Amino acid sequence: RKEELKVIVDHQKKHLFRFQNPVKKYSDFIGIENAILFCPDDLSLFTSSPKNRRRFIDMELMKLSKTYTSTLSSYQKLLKQRNQALKQSNIDECLVQIYLDQMIEVQSVIIKQRNEFLNSLMNKARELYPFFSNEKEEIGAKYMTFIPIDPDMKSHMKEAYDKVFEKEKRYHQTLIGIHRDDILFELN
């Protein structure tokens, strides 16, 4: 089936069209055409903050999966709600725990997807890198999260959150989680 997609970017915002009809939500574009564009500005990915690296991987995954988009959105809402609960003068620990239990569920999904995506991307990059470089360097990247990535991720998360809970109450915010993850790039 032939699709016609158009994106017009002006100095104020993006305008999205599908078959000449305006599209209100970016998520309506997801999964129609899979493409990753790389330009010189993207080199900042290696030198900028972890937030920008997370944003890069999230944007690419959102292009590939509406499920990822909704899961990430759920996490962001839960994180905001948990942080609001931690900011109360009289913290409702039961409510904070309810948010945490839900956060653990969605984080396990996001961690797996981010890690799988990065591994897949790096496999392709290792395959193509020799065509762009005369050097015999080996490149790599690792997804750095706050827990080991294994079948027991959820129990590791629970333990990690239990260890920092008193500190979170003092700082009135969630101190660990996927919102603090990073990508470690390696050369040789």
Residue positions per predicted region:
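Alpha-helix initiation and N-capping motif
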Residues: Y26, P50, R54, L79, ...
